[in-house]
Amino acid sequence: MYKYLHILNDIENKIQNGDIKEGKKLPSIRSLVTQYECNKATVIRALHELEKRHIIYSVPQSGYYVVKKSENTIENNEIIDFASSAPDPDVFPYLDFQHCINKAIDTYKNDLFVYGTPKGLPSLIPVIQKQLANYQVFTKEENIFITSGVQQALAILTSIPFPNGNETVLIEQPTYHLYIDYLEINKVPVIGIKRTNEGIDLNELEQIFQTGKIKFFYTIPRYHHPLGISYSKDEKEKIALLAKKYNVFIVEDDYLADLETDSKADPLYSLDNCSHVIYLKSYSKIIFPGLRVGVAVIPPSIANAFYTYKKILDIDSPMISQAALEIYIKSGMFERHKNKIKSSYYNRSIKLAKTLEKVQNENPSLFTYNRQNTSGIHTCLEIQKNIVTETLIQKLGDIQISVDTIDKNYMRDFPKEKLLKLNVSNIKEDKIEEGIRKIIEEIKQLRQFNFQFRKE
């Protein structure tokens, strides 16, 4: 990363985290030169970029100051929202992406009026191919499909015939709730396999692969939704070997690949010979859900069927979004934004983990939390069986704390764990401990109430 981008990201994160307050003056250029061990021109370039993004402003003969946000923004942040998994709107560079949209309309204005690119915008595909290589996903252009989000890719994969001739889909429990809804509404044969902080039972997985007539296994190896855990390299290798042995396809949903902090954490796709693993990538968490652009890397054995169904279902995925994304990636803006949001979310995830460990040590019997080696934007707490979660959620809502259970992430008849989901993508770092302590206080009160009720 260029030095000025490092300085820019660092200052921006400090502003977002409240280390540098709104309306306050930044350190002098001379101080920043010393702090970041660089030359004056590099610091000035970073400051000019921040000024262009309306994050800071300059006062002649005085220095640079942090822009004050509107009162409405501050009011909206009063709710401490652990329930939402949407990206933080405050860290999205609206002006940058607006510029890319305008540029896309100017550049591709003729293409916007033409039907017939079901594989995706032709000029975007090689850009995506190059980007995927950074995630250790090496593939040919003809295997890359641009879809209207990962949900569309899942719908197509569920519908098309597979070479193994099987029809049953295997999913982790819990998993992505909208895919569960899709399977149930369309009456697709489905089997669930339990996933916990310890992973999945590989012996059970092999038994299901061997006898269950499985079409494909839908899995979220990295930063699992909603558990927040990741498979180890050993687990991924064993899953890939089992898939090949029993001719079962793997659908790998790598929706948080851009937030990975471990450079050695390669996707499951990289461990396969590209014949049994289908790789899905989303931009909804790193940019915004409304972009409606996803990427599917499809093996040659099902590429024609995927193309045909995609064309029938949706002639084009959003062309303006695709064109804007191409410009956003090629300009280097995507990489800069990725580094900024990854740093911001990483700091929040570490704050969440440390707070939960501290609070658990203070209240050892109140809830169960197992810190993972990986630090994602969400995790789960196991609460006592006698706590009525609906009551807890209602009481927390009354004091402006939003949380949720993971009940909807289970199939209807699958045994559910009593887990409380905590997501920090929409919470400022300095609000995390306050929110956690309020949650714990409400759990204490409900436990005390239950204890008194039993005594009476």
Please report, for each region that a protein language model flagged, where it lies by residue.
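Conserved core of the PLP fold type I
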Residues: 112-246, 258-259, 263-271, 450-454
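Hydrophobic residues in beta-strands of the RecA-like P-loop NTPase core, especially within AAA+ ATPase
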Residues: 171, 251-252
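PLP-dependent aminotransferase class I/II
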Residues: 278-362, 370-371
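N-terminal basic, amphipathic alpha-helical segments
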Residues: 1-104, 110-116, 124-130, 311-318, ...
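Short, solvent-exposed loop/turn elements at beta->coil junctions and helix N-caps
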Residues: 283, 367-368, 407-411
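Residue-level marker for buried hydrophobic side chains located in beta-strands
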Residues: 82, 250-251
